[in-house]
Design a protein with these regions (language model features):
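N-terminal glycine-/lysine-enriched basic segments
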Residues: 1-68, 72-98
């Protein structure tokens, strides 16, 4: 019981990181879409890094909660990873290299 509680608590920080990273990915994708072609590369790089961060943090949550498949945070991280991936796809298709 103590281990389960510790793992549950250990999921808090990576969940917060996944949330923040997904928000960064979505914002950077919008910036990439609106920016001048010569400046879009930085925003696209930000999307890719943020998506990777979201995915890595989500995986930590999944590992920590592996013994609690009913935990609603697992669905939350699935959604966050999906959103970050959508942002990545949007950024990569919105701009072609100049």
């Amino acid at each position: 019981a103590r281990l389960a509680a510790a793992l549950s608590e250990a999921s808090r920080a990576p969940l917060a990181i996944a949330r923040a990273s997904t928000q960064v990915a979505e914002l950077a994708a919008r910036i990439a879409e609106m920016s001048k072609p010569e400046l879009a590369g930085d925003a696209i790089a930000a999307v890719l890094l943020a998506e990777a961060s979201s995915r890595a943090a989500a995986r930590l949550v999944e590992i920590n909660l592996a013994q609690r498949p009913e935990d609603p945070r697992l669905a939350v991280v699935d959604e966050l990873v999906e959103r970050a991936g959508t942002a990545r796809d949007a950024a990569l298709t919105s701009r072609k290299p100049p």
